[in-house]
Swiss-Prot record:
PANTHER family linked to this entry: PROTEIN GP17, SECRETED PROTEIN A
GO CC terms: extracellular region; lamellar body; post-lysosomal vacuole
Top-level lineage group: Eukaryota
Subcellular location field: Secreted; Extracellular vesicle
Organism phylogeny: Eukaryota, Amoebozoa, Evosea, Eumycetozoa, Dictyostelia
Glycosylation sites: N156
Family according to the record: Belongs to the Sct family.
Organism whose genome encodes this protein: Dictyostelium discoideum
Keyword annotations: Disulfide bond, Glycoprotein, Secreted, Signal
Protein name: Secreted protein A
PTM summary: Probably contains disulfide bonds.
Signal peptide annotation: 1-19
């Protein structure tokens, strides 16, 4: 039994560290830029590929959102979205370090609102996760894509989906 628990712990540790390799973080950041519709030059892409930030917060956020969707628990989804805001706060820091300035302030603002629940943005997302505002973009589909891509180690695709969510929120805030 101890061996089984030890093996499980090692697997979990290995699985978490996989998501945090520079290549995977870079893929996520490049995908995020695509989702928000930021054009990256080759220097910016190379810089992002070398970023060594950890993105453990995304793992936690996606687990909570996924579990909340499956169990229809608004509180879990709400907590997951708040955690997602905390995770997204690292994105502008990494972009700034790579000389990317487009939408950085907007991303910071949305991340801050998500992480603190300011202006009811988390409630807006919860309400609109079923179907989002006048553009009829389905945020729940973007969340589910981000989660599925993350689980399958498609960090670029997960980044595109999260970037698309943030892009929709930036557009909705204008």
């Amino acid at each position: 039994m101890r061996l089984l628990i030890t093996l499980f712990a090692i697997f979990a540790l290995f699985n978490c560290s996989l998501a945090n390799t520079a290549t995977n973080v870079g893929e996520f950041l490049i995908g995020f830029a695509q989702g928000v519709e930021i054009t990256l030059n080759s220097n910016s892409q190379a810089c992002l590929s070398g970023v060594t930030s950890t993105f453990d917060e995304f793992q936690t956020a996606f687990q909570l959102i996924d579990s909340g969707f499956k169990s229809k628990s608004i509180n879990q989804v709400k907590t997951g979205i708040t955690d997602l805001g905390l995770a997204i706060q690292q994105v502008p820091v990494d972009y700034d370090a790579c000389g990317i300035t487009q939408f950085v302030e907007e991303i910071e603002e949305i991340a801050s609102k998500l992480s603190s629940g300011v202006d009811g943005i988390v409630d807006v997302i919860l309400k609109e996760a079923v179907e989002i505002w006048e553009h009829k973009n389905d945020l729940s589909a973007d969340f589910k894509t981000a989660i599925a891509d993350w689980k399958s180690s498609n960090y670029n695709g997960s980044g595109v989906a999260v970037g698309s969510i943030i892009g929709d929120l930036i557009q909705g805030a204008k």
